[in-house]
């Protein structure tokens, strides 16, 4: 009997193996591999240098007709390709990027495909619909299964009720990171992307997505009793009502029983697992940009990245003037004068220039003569950017864009979307296209992480989806912004530019910070704020403080004003997630190097071998000897430097340094 049972088991195992098909795809350097298994379900795994870091993880898509792409799938064909090309990357961390991968397409009966790509620093896949009949996507499974109880650094959704995921889908995508074992992650809270899992031995896995057009964004949740992160998507809105912040949002009151509508052949978003063996390689990955759809714009000549003098963070505070400051023409003329004197490209009119609670951007408050401000700014070679709440912009988008473009406005900062369901991600692309039509740049605030849109529409220069410096207006000292700063280059910035809004001139050493809405400060040192203009990527980059504070600090201000916001080349020289990072960036023949640390004092050695074979002159801003007590303390010094030089810099707790080499 035992012999018969054994034989039957052998036969069943043989039949099961015969029913399964497996395909292996390796990165160009051979270090990363994924094995895709087609059987009762569709799974893939990832190995790095022969070690499995992602165990077979299921992927599928359930349609409203009952079809499940990924269950008992019938393969109809395969194709492979290898690509090694340079692509243009305007208004980014480098002027061009290498797109180097091996690809595998699996074609299935019933008009659907799955495409896999293996890069040297990650594995990505996406579903593709080839059919012409419309349908609804009920659910998509994009789970991540790990071989052990690894440590993850995740941003939880802050809004909504515990366990009520539908209430959590309305959120601002802003939070610090929680680091814990997979088994100890909060199962009542959604996690938004990107997030990082530490696979040990230096290997980290950053999960994100790209080409997120007209499809809901991906969230993950912790699974009970498994080393697994499970996928979640916001359902399609069934009923929305105007409300939220100053009546500028559309609140979802009822949901459909599906997540997306599909009415034609299309590509679905790329699911990306960035996999690197060093933290500095993680911070340097370009996969989110590379996997965005190519540019749909032919003329980019009018797009002008740059810095912007910002009003809201400093609460329109000026001193030494003979008028009452606030949302009025005299205040904005002072901001324009400051921008012009320092070569700052833009001034933004943040919330307050349009009549409150009307959600109508054609109604301007009586204290503002917008045409006069636009003309005054133009006479001083400064562009005007207008803030707009989501609903006010969306409801009359073309008229708003046409009217203000004709007036001479240069772009919009659109805020308070706070959703990433299919309706909202479709809006992002429509807004980008409409702004491009009228030659307007776009900053998407109050939105999710970048996911390839800035490649498809390069006029979209920045995205929020980051727990930026605005949080220091109200956050308690228990919020460790300094720690967060040395996490985001390895997590949030993996997905693209960040509207972090640095540049504070009031700088608090540890223990001295307190929230102040009208006269806010940063955590950490002055030189940290300077360094953030190099370490963080923001093609449209705010100067958050008041012109009055900048004019009291001319040396720091002049240095900030000359730092480019887009680059020809970027190199992450060194770094460890959560501790420190040092980044070098080149524009033309000039290099900038920025470094920041956590609350630990640190001695950094900068290897200058990235320089060319000639002599250079360096200007260094470094923490002063008393920066551990007074965050504003710094020292500026100049000296010659060569390619074979090594520069040693001491960073105070919460400190940083910024270096210009030319």
Swiss-Prot record:
Record bears the keyword Plastid: no
Signal among keywords: yes
InterPro entries: Aldolase_TIM, GH-type_carb-bd, GH97_C, GH97_catalytic, GH97_N, Glyco_hydro_b, Glycoside_hydrolase_SF, Glycosyl_hydrolase_97
Range of residues in the leader sequence: 1-19
Catalytic activity: Hydrolysis of terminal, non-reducing alpha-D-galactose residues in alpha-D-galactosides, including galactose oligosaccharides, galactomannans and galactolipids
Consequence of substituting residue 415 to N/G: Loss of catalytic activity. The activity is restored by adding an external nucleophilic azide ion
One Pfam family here: GH97_N
Regulation: Inhibited by EDTA in vitro.
Enzyme Commission no: 3.2.1.22
Cofactor note: Binds 1 Ca(2+) ion per subunit.
Superkingdom to which the source organism belongs: Bacteria
Activity versus pH, per record: Optimum pH is 8.0 with p-nitrophenyl alpha-galactoside as substrate.
One example GO MF annotation: glucan 1,4-alpha-glucosidase activity
Gene3D superfamilies: 2.70.98.10, Aldolase class I (3.20.20.70), Golgi alpha-mannosidase II (2.60.40.1180)
Cofactor (UniProt): Ca(2+)
Residues that bind Ca(2+): 174, 464, 470
Active-site residues from the entry: 415 (nucleophile), 470 (proton donor/acceptor)
Record's keyword terms, sorted: Calcium, Carbohydrate metabolism, Glycosidase, Hydrolase, Metal-binding, Signal
The protein's enzyme class: hydrolase
Assigned protein family: Belongs to the glycosyl hydrolase 97 family.
Record note on quaternary structure: Monomer.
Purpose of the protein: Galactosidase that is able to hydrolyze the alpha-1,6 disaccharide melibiose and the synthetic p-nitrophenyl alpha-galactoside substrate (pNP-Gal), with retention of the anomeric configuration. Does not hydrolyze DNP-Glc or pNP-Glc.
Name of the molecule in the record: Retaining alpha-galactosidase
């Amino acid at each position: 009997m035992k012999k018969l049972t054994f034989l039957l088991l052998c036969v069943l195992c043989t039949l099961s193996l015969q029913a399964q098909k497996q395909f292996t795809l390796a990165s160009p350097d051979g270090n990363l591999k994924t094995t895709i298994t087609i059987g009762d379900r569709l799974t893939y795994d990832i190995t790095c240098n022969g070690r499995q870091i992602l165990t077979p993880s299921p992927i599928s898509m359930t349609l409203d007709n009952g079809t499940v792409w990924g269950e008992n799938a019938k393969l109809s064909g395969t194709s492979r390709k290898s690509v090694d090309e340079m692509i243009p990357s305007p208004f980014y961390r480098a002027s061009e990027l290498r797109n180097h991968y091996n690809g595998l397409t699996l074609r299935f009966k019933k008009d659907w495909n799955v495409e896999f790509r293996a890069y040297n620093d990650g594995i990505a896949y996406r579903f593709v619909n080839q059919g012409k009949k419309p349908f609804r996507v009920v659910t998509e499974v994009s789970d991540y299964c790990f071989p052990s109880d690894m440590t993850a650094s995740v941003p939880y959704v802050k809004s909504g009720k515990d366990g009520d995921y539908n209430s959590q889908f309305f959120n601002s995508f802003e939070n610090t990171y929680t680091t814990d074992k997979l088994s100890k992650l909060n199962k009542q809270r959604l996690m938004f992307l990107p997030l990082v899992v530490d696979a040990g031995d230096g290997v980290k896995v950053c999960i994100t997505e790209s080409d997120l057009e007209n499809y809901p964004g991906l969230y993950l949740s912790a699974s009970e009793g498994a080393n697994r992160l499970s996928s979640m998507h916001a359902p399609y809105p069934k009923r929305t009502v105007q409300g939220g912040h100053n009546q500028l949002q559309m609140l979802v009151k009822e949901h459909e029983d599906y997540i997306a509508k599909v009415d034609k052949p299309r590509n679905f978003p790329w699911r990306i697992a960035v996999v690197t063996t060093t933290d500095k390689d993680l911070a340097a990955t370009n996969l989110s940009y590379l996997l965005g759809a190519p540019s749909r714009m032919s003329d980019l000549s009018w797009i002008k990245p740059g810095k912007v003098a910002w009003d809201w963070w400093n609460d329109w505070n000026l001193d030494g003037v003979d008028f009452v400051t606030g949302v009025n023409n005299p205040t904005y003329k002072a901001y324009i004068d400051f921008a012009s004197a320092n070569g700052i490209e833009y001034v933004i009119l943040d919330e307050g220039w349009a009549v409150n609670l009307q959600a109508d951007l054609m109604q301007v408050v009586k204290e503002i003569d917008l045409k006069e401000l636009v003309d005054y700014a133009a006479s001083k070679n400064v562009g005007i950017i207008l803030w707009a709440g989501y609903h006010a912009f969306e409801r009359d988008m073309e008229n708003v864009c046409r009217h203000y473009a004709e007036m001479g406005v240069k772009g919009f900062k659109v805020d308070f979307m706070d959703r990433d369901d299919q309706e909202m991600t479709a809006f992002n692309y429509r807004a980008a296209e409409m702004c491009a039509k009228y030659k307007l740049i776009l900053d998407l605030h109050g939105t999710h992480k970048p996911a390839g849109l800035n490649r498809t529409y390069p006029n979209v220069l920045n995205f929020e989806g980051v727990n930026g410096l605005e949080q220091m207006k109200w956050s308690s000292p228990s919020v460790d912004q300094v720690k967060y700063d040395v996490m985001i280059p390895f997590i949030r910035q993996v997905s693209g530019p960040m509207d972090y809004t640095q540049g504070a001139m009031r700088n608090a050493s540890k223990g001295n910070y307190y929230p102040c809405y009208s006269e806010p400060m940063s955590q950490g040192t002055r030189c940290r704020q300077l360094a953030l203009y190099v370490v963080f990527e923001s093609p449209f980059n705010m100067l958050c403080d008041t012109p009055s504070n900048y004019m009291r600090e001319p040396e720091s201000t002049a240095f900030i004003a000359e730092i480019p916001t887009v680059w020809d080349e970027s190199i992450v020289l060194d770094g460890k997630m959560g501790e420190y990072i040092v980044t070098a960036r080149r524009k033309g023949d000039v290099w900038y190097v920025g470094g920041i640390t956590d609350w630990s004092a640190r001695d950094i050695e900068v290897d200058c071998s990235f320089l060319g074979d000639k002599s250079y002159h360096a200007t260094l801003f470094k923490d002063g000897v008393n920066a551990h007590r007074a965050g504003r303390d710094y020292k500026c010094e100049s000296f010659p430097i060569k390619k074979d030089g090594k520069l040693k810099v001491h960073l105070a707790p919460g400190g940083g340094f910024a270096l210009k080499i030319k």
